[in-house]
A protein has these predicted regions:
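Glycine-rich flavin
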Residues: 75-83, 87-201
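Glycine-rich phosphate/pyrophosphate-binding beta-alpha loops
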Residues: 198-203, 292, 412-415
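A short core secondary-structure module
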Residues: 196-239
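Amphipathic, small/basic residue-rich leader segments at the start of a protein or domain
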Residues: 4, 14-125
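C-terminal helix-coil-helix/basic helical segment that borders enzyme active sites and/or dimer interfaces
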Residues: 65-68, 342-375, 385-396
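Glycine-rich beta->alpha junctions and the first turn(s) of the following alpha-helix
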Residues: 245-340
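Glycine-rich phosphate/cofactor-binding loops in nucleotide/flavin-utilizing enzymes
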Residues: 21-24, 391-433
Length: 433
């Protein structure tokens, strides 16, 4: 790849979203206190949270078509999510929502703009890894800084893992991105990071990039693999516009290149020898991130269903004298799509309820999320294919959103774990019984 001129983006706002509360009391003109939006949602519970998500989704929907056509980042969408109090949805110090509520929020936001919802899901998932810290690997000062910035205003976090040669690390291998020990200008030890990451969801909007990389083979402690935590405005960080995908175009999942990026020594997190075993944080949060990804595509199918229902009710061919919605063929096809949507919802939210219950129930449910992902994502694609086949040319027109919903749905298969891995592992398990 050829490195283009680095492009920068505005830093995060330091103003936490707030809402003024008024009361019916005679307060003698005493000013009403300002209450942070996330505190208001925490006090209001799921009903208030989902109402905020619906309002934010309406705002996201306004620019969804334009950002899809341009393949452009939508900072106004992220700002709307934070203004609604949803930016720190799952942080205990934020809204503190459980998985079921979080998934319902994501589903609603995805009906507005699934590409923004994808960026948001990555943020929620990696904040959770950081705060849960099951392996006890995160330096407290660094963790608290990231959390504080997210609470203060849009400060997106994502992990950058995939590389041009290696592909996804979920299938094994040592990343080519290298962190090498060096001495900084102040005489203190630092890391110098070099490498290239692809499919970096959120790219221009990120404040923190958790970069999967390896130390050099000549490192005094031997080669180790882990995370290098990079503030996105660090000199040497370059974003190269390579994302020109069929779907999720506004996720701006461009390449990020690190040119001799200098990091404090404490920004290397969770380093361990190659082959030391799976990242415990990743295992613990697999159910969460998979459920939230499924929620995105559950929302995408519902968007397609709703548009189709509206179109069939409004379309009145002159030779019929009634809407297409009156014909049994169309009723049956929409019924099939609704059956798929209902199945997806039941699978997703029965799983999230199990996880929220904790204990043995959560432990028993956890491994099943991969199978649920396979079923749900294929149901979404099947449902939208059926909708396209039902109405023909109008469904493929850029004048209507159905083709966009379908293109976005096709991206569901690329998320880890992928279908072939899940089905092979499941089949092997059955055959070994």
């Amino acid at each position: 790849f050829t490195c283009n001129t680095p492009r920068r983006f505005p830093g995060p706002s330091n103003q936490r979203s707030r809402m003024t509360i008024t009361t019916s009391q005679d307060a003698s003109d005493v000013p009403a206190p300002d209450v942070p939006a996330d505190a208001r949602l925490r006090a209001g519970g799921p009903a208030e949270i989902l109402a905020a998500a619906d309002r934010a989704a309406d705002l996201l929907a306004e620019g969804a078509d334009r950002h899809d056509r341009e393949g452009s980042y939508a900072p106004e969408n992220i700002a709307a999510i934070w203004a609604a109090g949803l930016g720190n949805l799952t942080l205990p110090s934020g809204v503190g929502a459980d998985l079921t509520t979080a998934a319902r929020v994501v589903e609603r936001l995805a009906q507005g703009d699934p590409a923004t919802a994808l960026i948001y899901v990555m943020h929620l998932a990696h904040l959770r890894i950081l705060v849960d810290d099951p392996g006890g690997i995160w330096p407290v000062e660094l963790r608290d800084r990231i959390v504080a910035e997210s609470l203060a205003g849009p400060a997106l976090v994502n992990a950058l893992r995939v590389e041009p040669e290696l592909g996804t690390p979920a299938r094994g291998g040592v990343p080519a991105t290298r962190g090498v020990r060096a001495v900084g200008a102040n005489g203190q030890p630092v890391w110098r990071l070099n490498g290239r990451k692809i499919y970096s969801t959120g790219s221009y909007g990120l404040r923190w990039m958790n970069v999967w990389g390896a130390t050099g083979t000549d490192d005094p402690d031997g080669q180790r693999i882990g995370w290098f935590v990079v503030p996105a405005d660090t000199p040497g960080v370059e974003i190269v516009d390579t994302w020109d995908h069929l779907g999720m175009r506004a996720s701006v999942s461009h390449d990020v290149v690190f040119h001799d990026v200098e990091l404090p020594f404490g920004h290397a997190v969770g380093l361990q020898a190659p082959g030391a075993g799976p990242d415990p944080a990743a295992l613990r949060t697999l159910g969460w991130i998979s459920a939230l990804l499924i929620a995105i595509y559950t929302g995408v199918l519902k968007s397609g269903r709703d548009w189709l229902a509206g179109y069939l009710n409004e379309r009145v061919p002159t030779n019929l004298g009634a809407s297409l919605a009156t014909l049994p063929r169309f009723q049956s096809a929409v019924g099939e799509i609704e059956t798929l949507a209902y199945t997806n919802e039941r699978l997703l939210y029965s799983f999230t309820a199990d996880i929220d219950a904790g204990g043995d129930r959560a432990a028993a449910a956890g491994p099943g999320i991969s199978i649920i992902k396979v079923v749900v994502t294929n149901n979404v694609i099947r449902g939208l294919e059926s909708a396209l086949g039902l109405i023909g040319n109008p469904g493929l027109s850029y004048h209507h959103p159905l083709q966009r919903h379908y293109r976005n749905a096709l991206c569901s298969r690329i998320h880890t774990p992928q279908d072939d891995v899940v089905l092979t592992a499941t089949g092997r398990s059955v055959l070994a019984r």
